[in-house]
Amino acid sequence: MAVPKRKMSRANTRMRRSQWKAQAPKLVKTVENGKVSYSLPHQAKLVSDSAGTPLFYEYKGRKVADA
């Protein structure tokens, strides 16, 4: 296993770590009943009635779980 010969300075350590970036999530735009919503892909969607009461979860057009 490689071992550093000298201690890395704070400035160099922080400079190296500043390159670590989190990627923004890729959202999918869906239009339902005239409302636009954004969600993560490959996740079950909550289906609700007109009053806003949650009914069930849906994935790829199939019911997968009760709400």
Curated annotation (Swiss-Prot):
GO cellular component terms, A-Z: large ribosomal subunit
Disordered, as annotated region: 1-22
Ranges of compositional bias, category Basic residues: 1-19
GO terms (BP aspect): translation
Gene Ontology MF terms in the entry: structural constituent of ribosome
Keywords (A to Z) from UniProt: Ribonucleoprotein, Ribosomal protein
Keyword Glycosyltransferase: no
HAMAP family assigned to the protein according to its UniProt record, in alphabetical order: Ribosomal_bL32
Family matches, as NCBIfam families: rpmF_bact
Family the UniProt entry places it in: Belongs to the bacterial ribosomal protein bL32 family.
UniProt protein name: Large ribosomal subunit protein bL32
Protein's organism: Kocuria rhizophila (strain ATCC 9341 / DSM 348 / NBRC 103217 / DC2201)
Gene: rpmF
